[in-house]
Amino acid sequence: MDIRKEFLDFFASKGHEIIASAPLVPDDASLLFTNAGMVPFKNIFTGAVPRPTPPIRTSCQTCIRAGGKHNDLDNVGYTARHHTFFEMLGNFSFGEYFKENAIAYAWEFITEILKLDKDKLYVTVHEKDDEAFEIWAKHIAKERIYRFGDHDNFWAMGDTGPCGPCSEIFYDQGEEYFHGKEDYMGGDGDRFLEIWNLVFMQFERDKAGNLSPLPKPSIDTGMGLERVTAIKEGVFSNYDSSIFMPLIHAVEKLCGKPYKYESGASYRVIADHIRSITFLIAQGVNFDKEGRGYVLRRILRRALRHGYLLGLKEPFMYKLVDNVCELMGHHYSYLLEKKETIKEIIKLEEERFLSTISAGLELFKAQLANTKDVFSGEIAFKLYDTYGFPLDLTADMLREIGKKVDEKKFDELMNEQKARAKASWKGSGDKIKEKGDFKALLEKFGENKFIGYETMKSQSKILAILNNDFRNVDELKAGNIGWIMLDETPFYAQSGGQIYDTGLINGSNKVTDTQKFFGLNLSEVETSTNLKVGDIVKCEVDEARIETARHHSATHLLHLALREILGSGVGQAGSSVDSERLRFDFTYPKSLTSEQLLKIENNVNSQISKGGASKTEIMDINEAIKSGAIAMFSEKYGDKVRVLTLGESKEFCGGTHVRNLWEIGSFYIVKESGVSAGVRRIEAVCSKAAINYAKNFRSEFSEVQNALKSNEALSAIKKLKDEIKSLKNEISKASAAKVIDLDEKNGIKFVVSEFDGDIKTKIDELKNENDKIVAVFFKVEDGRVQIAAGVKNAPLKAGEIVKQIAKILGGGGGGRDDFATAGGKDMTKIDEAVNFARDLIKAKI
């Protein structure tokens, strides 16, 4: 049985509109990830936005609980039901139906569609909710209805705001299997398993804690797909269900060891974590040093450590992406489109961590030998800072053997060195929204209309004026700054990567910014004359908008070119367009070659030269997705979306664009670079900006020729390079004569250092002078890092040393046991590589 489909179809038959799963990265600054089915509807429940039509919805929402307030990461693998990634089935009513229907629907679905045994079902209600009790009594015997207090059966969105009693449905897994002290209704045992929570949002709580009835009570329900699947299949752990067992079997094949539930925590960790990793990367989250990207990194590194316990010491997680796509690609088709890109990104990150995990574990074991109960915070920090071990990974390893880490000392070192800035998810923008009069304006006027697609000039009425504190005022005096709400505005509010419009009101009042607050398009104005609410004013958008539109359209063509040349797995990770340039971030695991960049540039210019009118359509979101239009996961869309077609490009977009591709003129790539692991960036110019760029380039090239005193720049540069090479050789000879300081441990001398001279000659010299030695040298030359290692009568292999070091530096290499060389291109990580090599040698000798 496809429970996901059965659930959605059931509620669709009851008049609910099926809503696609919202992005895992929510449009909510207070949340790290979407962690519940109601998150996409939060602003509807709070009244911040009008209720939709129809006001009843159903969804299967993908959720992440790792990091932030809701963090299940530490428990995953060790319990039957904790997950970092899960799917939440839900039905929602925004002031339409209430308890009677919600309870009836839930009972019908569970007993008639899922056909769960009625004799194994129990429900709970709030101790004061007589209404819910009486409704349930129509469906189930009263002795199966339990009353509990606020702790168990009252739900609140926060300290203030919408809240209400809830009712939970439980399934009895059997006294014959569960008979512990906590295995009773209301206990913490596993016998009675909660499967569905029905929240009756009927009150508003104020700051004093007082409850007042909501004018239109709402319904929010949630049922975990993994949990109900396990019950339906008659297994006691979610991990024993058809959702996880194919992944666990895949891990068995990789490690060659059979899975046993009692000792299978590592299998379960890997099976859970690969789902989170796959979905997050598919939706544009990438490995990073902070924020969501760092949570993603923690999840992968935790899985790799558990893989290490199973004997998996080479990259393996990326191979499991195929299994996730096979299991879930039929419902989430974007997984199939991005599968190969996801695999490459994961593999690259695996290689980074696996290059240091061995030495990190050696350091961990060495410190463990000196640990009684509490593991050193200093060593935990070193594991984190040098070897990439997240603190919770170290804590996880210690928990398995009954020890703890000194987190206080770890935090102290973090603060001292400021190695990682904690991501803050509540910005100043949210404070503005909290104190502003936006909600009142929305209730009074609704969303004001943007007419800038058709015109850059208008006569509009001032509906409202806000001062700098975003409070309503009747008038803005000359010489002041404030925000104006027009009934119809030609000014584009910054969104979707496109910069805001500027312009003039009544010829002399400068529009300096335009932003959107709760659906309201507001323009910031520096006044030279008085402006009053009710005034009819002339509005004019700056000409810069025309160039911005050209760059925005070029961005769409670039996206199409990238997908055609690099593969359909390429996804947009961000963009920024203005009148002077465009910037496009996209998921791709490696830097682009000059040949690829030329192909991309030619592709875009070819699309421009073909011309063709742009086309926009307002479509139902599900219809738009089916039509092949591309959407961005990080954007939040309504029920209706604007779909833009430019030649072969078709995307969701609310921005302004050219009417015909010819208007773009020409397109030129200025720069390609890396943003973070698995994310690349292209910066480009078009139209007038491209012409200006060409002029500046010609001028700079002329200056180069003048500086070289030659019209043949290439030959002059070659001559200079030869002279530099000759000078470097002289420096190298001088460096080779320098005395090298050696360290010693257990009778073996060793050195790890940067060296300007001939590193092979120096290693040979040291090996001739010493009976037992390990030498590793780094040399920067021509934008790359050269690595050489020499070993004589020591328990290390030079080939293995350079191989691991090169991974840190983004390169590769190898060689004999006594001598080996390698290269790398990431010069920013030389210090990390030096420290790693030094620790590796110390651990081995």
Swiss-Prot record:
GO biological process, one term: alanyl-tRNA aminoacylation
Keywords: Aminoacyl-tRNA synthetase, ATP-binding, Cytoplasm, Ligase, Metal-binding, Nucleotide-binding, Protein biosynthesis, RNA-binding, tRNA-binding, Zinc
NCBIfam families xrefs: alaS (TIGR00344)
Protein name: Alanine--tRNA ligase
Binding site for Zn(2+): H552, H556, C653, H657
Coiled-coil stretches: none
Cofactor binding summary note: Binds 1 zinc ion per subunit.
Domain notes: Consists of three domains; the N-terminal catalytic domain, the editing domain and the C-terminal C-Ala domain. The editing domain removes incorrectly charged amino acids, while the C-Ala domain, along with tRNA(Ala), serves as a bridge to cooperatively bring together the editing and aminoacylation centers thus stimulating deacylation of misacylated tRNAs.
Family: Belongs to the class-II aminoacyl-tRNA synthetase family.
Catalytic reactions of this protein: tRNA(Ala) + L-alanine + ATP = L-alanyl-tRNA(Ala) + AMP + diphosphate
Cellular component GO terms held in the UniProt record: cytosol
SMART domains found in the cross-reference section: tRNA_SAD (SM00863)
Molecular-function annotations in GO: alanine-tRNA ligase activity; aminoacyl-tRNA deacylase activity; ATP binding; tRNA binding; zinc ion binding
PANTHER family tied to this protein: ALANINE--TRNA LIGASE, CYTOPLASMIC, ALANYL-TRNA SYNTHETASE
Cofactor: Zn(2+)
Localization, UniProt: Cytoplasm
EC number: 6.1.1.7
Primary role: Catalyzes the attachment of alanine to tRNA(Ala) in a two-step reaction: alanine is first activated by ATP to form Ala-AMP and then transferred to the acceptor end of tRNA(Ala). Also edits incorrectly charged Ser-tRNA(Ala) and Gly-tRNA(Ala) via its editing domain.
InterPro entries per UniProt: aa-tRNA-synth_II/BPL/LPL (IPR045864), Ala-tRNA-lgiase_IIc (IPR002318), Ala-tRNA-ligase_IIc_anticod-bd (IPR018162), Ala-tRNA-synth_IIc_core (IPR018165), Ala-tRNA-synth_IIc_N (IPR018164), Ala-tRNA_ligase (IPR050058), Ala_tRNA_ligase_euk/bac (IPR023033), DHHA1_dom (IPR003156)
